[in-house]
Amino acid sequence: WKFKNFIIKKLLLILCFVPLVSFGQEIKGKKLFSIKAAVGEWQSSVGEYLNLKTIYAPYAKGVFDGIAKGKVLPIGGDYPLYYQENGKTFSDLDIDMVLLTEDNEKIYCKASGVFNYVTETFESLKFQTHWRFRTSSEKYKFLNDVMGIGFGFVLPADSEYNFQHDIYDVHLK
């Protein structure tokens, strides 16, 4: 009987850990873009929706590099919904952006995400985004199938840009 208990315990232990070993999935990714953007004259109170405030922050200029280099066209911007609580701002981002590559190809970018920060200092607490791309360019048409993951950064006050987005194509191995 002791031997059977021992075998049953070993089998249960193996059954518990086999899924972790055999079905564990790994992800891989590559960096697509680093985008630096400057916000132009923004409107502080466009309206409210479900007790959330909204603003419009247009992009005035920007640059990017990675799989291509170029500039951010002064089209689109960010239309976040946000609320403030206990000295912090919690934002739900809604970004529209058009990139123009050095080889004159346009890439439309749409992103959503979160940007939470200390209201008084603009210190970033969380800045993550999800990106989709659209282009008619033959060279970059693979981007139409990419769902990018972005990590954002607030740039120093003396920079000519306000924000940086590092965007990765992440998928299962």
Regions found by a protein language model. Give the residues of each.
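Sec-dependent N-terminal signal peptides
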Residues: 11-20
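Beta-strand-enriched cores of mature, soluble protein domains
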Residues: 25-173
